[in-house]
């Protein structure tokens, strides 16, 4: 395990599913309001890091194992976000995970759909333009400790190009279908790099300035960039040495 201390966060080259890394993070941050995770999906992406010989049940159980460990690092009412996909025929670990992860002290509060602009798929099926984000709350209530959800503005009527007659607008709460974030196509820093805005939203909603947010699968380091923009601190954990080295280099001043 390698720990790099930056001015506004911590990067760890290690296995986030290990007790050693968990203990190290807890010693540094104490309990936190938000943990984010974008794990490998398992045989879904045609990349070496996504290959697994596990069945979907075994893969779901692997996810459950580190979820149960890391939920202990959350404050009461803390939020736990996990990215996932519908999978492929015969291999749907994320769907099994959603059912198995919930218990009386860990509630599945919502499943968010990120509606993307680019579609993919095969000719004999509907095209996919979505990705799922499970949102859990620690405790026996679905009410999170912090929920600072911003209102979104929606313009109605004509385009409003005439300054004499500005377009009317109204504000509305964000739904569990996010259509206002454009994805990154073939991210340059990681094959499945998330758009920064889609990472910022949970940080805005569940944390306050100065809070720590923990990312269990650091990847491109997008969570750190989002945290910096919003005045939060971060802990990023990445197992792959090459991905880790690139991530830390990008995050250095």
Regions found by a protein language model. Name each.
Residues 1-237, 242-244:
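Core catalytic lobe of class I
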């Amino acid at each position: 395990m390698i720990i790099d201390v930056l001015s506004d966060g911590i990067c760890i080259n290690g296995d986030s599913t290990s007790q050693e890394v968990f203990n190290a993070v807890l010693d540094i941050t104490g309990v936190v309001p938000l943990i984010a995770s974008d794990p490998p999906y398992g045989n879904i992406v045609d990349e070496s890091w996504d290959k697994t010989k596990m069945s979907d049940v075994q893969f779901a159980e692997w996810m459950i194992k580190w979820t149960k460990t890391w939920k202990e690092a959350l404050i009461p009412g803390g939020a736990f976000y996990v990215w996932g996909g519908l999978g492929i025929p015969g291999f749907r670990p994320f769907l099994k995970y959603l059912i198995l992860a919930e218990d009386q002290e860990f509630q599945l509060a919502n499943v968010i759909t990120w509606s993307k602009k680019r579609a993919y798929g095969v000719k004999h099926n509907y095209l996919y333009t979505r990705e799922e984000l499970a949102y859990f709350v620690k405790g026996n209530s679905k009410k999170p400790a912090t929920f600072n959800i911003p209102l979104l503005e929606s313009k109605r009527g004509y385009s409003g190009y005439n300054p004499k007659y500005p377009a009317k607008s109204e504000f509305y709460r964000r739904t569990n279908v996010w259509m206002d974030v454009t994805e990154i196509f073939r991210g340059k820093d990681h094959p499945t790099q998330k758009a920064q805005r889609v990472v910022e939203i949970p940080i805005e909603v569940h944390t306050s300035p100065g809070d720590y947010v923990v990312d269990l699968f650091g990847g491109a380091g997008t969570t750190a960039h989002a945290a910096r923009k919003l005045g939060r601190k971060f802990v990023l954990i990445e197992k792959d040495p090459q991905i880790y080295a690139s991530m830390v280099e990008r995050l250095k001043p």
